[in-house]
Amino acid sequence: MKQLLDFIPLIIFFTVYKLHDIYAATGALMATTLLQMIVVWVMYKKLERSHWITLVLVLGFGAMTLFFHNEAFIKWKVTVLYAAFGSALWISQFLFRKPLIKKMLGKEMSLPDAVWNRINFSWGLFFWMVGALNVYIAFYLPTEIWVDFKVFGVLGLMLVSTLLTGIYIYRYLPTNNQQDKE
């Protein structure tokens, strides 16, 4: 349910952009993101760190977009967000020696540390690459293409990366025979 709520501001942004323009879509994104966070808070009594980061970036970059009437700000938000996520993953691994991915998913599955490190590094790289791709699409292609990329391209890349991670993890998961022996 929480993941479904994460898509609502994106859907509203896309719809309002197609019906109006980037500025109306930015205002709608700001309002629906704030509303989304209120709903998540009421339902779960907690906001994840990623929700706080997203809220601050959407409101900050959205406000600058509207105040300066310059769409570059909202376009930069995607890159800044993914650079922050990628950096957090790499800092957790290389500075603190505790991969953030393991902290997030370690209760769900048991994997060797080397596997957690590879997954953590790969997702950090993924976020940095999507951020870089966003810069190219946002500033060298028309805004309409950027909006489509932001909504569908990033989602598609995320699904492919998740699928590849799942395939990679699968060979390290215990089989039923191993679980029966324990």
Swiss-Prot record:
Transmembrane segments: 22-42, 53-73, 76-96, 121-141, 149-169
GO cellular component: plasma membrane
Keywords, comma-separated and alphabetical: Cell inner membrane, Cell membrane, Membrane, Transmembrane, Transmembrane helix
InterPro entries, per database record: YciB
KW Cell inner membrane (keyword) present: yes
Pfam families, per database record: IspA
Record localization: Cell inner membrane
Lipid bilayer topology: Multi-pass membrane protein
Similarity-based family: Belongs to the YciB family.
Free-text function comment from the UniProt entry: Plays a role in cell envelope biogenesis, maintenance of cell envelope integrity and membrane homeostasis.
Protein name per its UniProtKB record: Inner membrane-spanning protein YciB
Organism: Tolumonas auensis (strain DSM 9187 / NBRC 110442 / TA 4)
